[in-house]
């Protein structure tokens, strides 16, 4: 699996840097700009929470999308299903790699605001939902474009839903829940992630038969 991912991602060249630049250039610059406006630590805290919830979930599926594109749309992709039909383990490795990539950023954040570890845990669940959404729609529709659009539309809609306070749809919140409150908040998203991952596995299983 690791060897497959290596060769699949090697082909995208410089685009491999997009998640790194997003996490360690784009988001910190937005945070610095927010802090520079008034040197207010409370405003910086809110900006960190907002920016991470907007950009981290999208960046988390960057490698996933390219691996899916290779498995679904590349010529001769039927050879990839001879030994290992289920591609979820490869996608989960991409997911775990992103969580590790995210750790240094949150080590800095929690040095300033200790409770932001709860935001990291929240993002781990939300990013699993994004993985499930990308996986399910890609194998269901057999088109990476549709999968990308589904991810982008959900990301945009969740921010818009938060502005009108639609409960159960949006994870985009300024307040970071902790402990049992966070668990209750994340249960619907975790269940949705599980359903989509199962649906993705089913569509993935039948994908070679439909070619």
What are these regions (language model features)?
Residues 15-29, 57, 59-62, 95-104, 131, 155, 192-197, ...:
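Alpha-helical transmembrane segments
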Residues 32-69, 90-152:
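Secretory targeting signals
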Residues 17-22, 92, 120-121, 148-149, ...:
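Hydrophobic alpha-helical transmembrane segments
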Residues 79-87:
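Short helix-to-coil transition segments within interhelical loops
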Residues 35-43, 141-211:
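Terminal transmembrane helical anchor/hairpin motif
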Residues 1-23, 137:
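Aromatic- and glycine-rich beta-strand/loop motifs that create alpha-glucan
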């Amino acid at each position: 699996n690791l060897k497959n991912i290596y060769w699949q991602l090697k082909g995208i060249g410089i685009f491999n840097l997009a998640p790194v630049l997003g996490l360690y250039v784009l988001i910190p610059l937005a945070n610095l700009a927010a802090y520079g406006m008034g040197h207010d630590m409370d405003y910086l805290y809110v900006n960190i929470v907002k920016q991470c919830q907007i950009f981290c979930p999208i960046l988390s599926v960057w490698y996933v999308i390219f691996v899916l594109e290779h498995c679904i749309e590349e010529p001769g992709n039927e050879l990839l299903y001879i030994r290992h039909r289920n591609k979820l383990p490869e996608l989960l490795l991409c997911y775990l790699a992103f969580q590790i990539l995210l750790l240094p950023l949150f080590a800095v954040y929690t040095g300033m605001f200790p409770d932001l570890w709860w935001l990291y845990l929240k993002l781990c669940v939300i990013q699993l939902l994004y993985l499930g959404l990308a996986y399910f729609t890609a194998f269901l529709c057999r088109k990476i474009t549709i999968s990308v659009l589904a991810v982008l539309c959900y990301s945009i809609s969740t921010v818009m839903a938060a502005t009108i306070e639609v409960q159960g749809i949006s994870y985009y919140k300024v307040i970071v829940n902790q402990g049992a409150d966070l668990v209750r908040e994340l249960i619907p998203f975790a269940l949705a992630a599980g359903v989509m991952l199962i649906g993705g596995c089913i569509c993935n299983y039948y994908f070679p038969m439909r070619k």
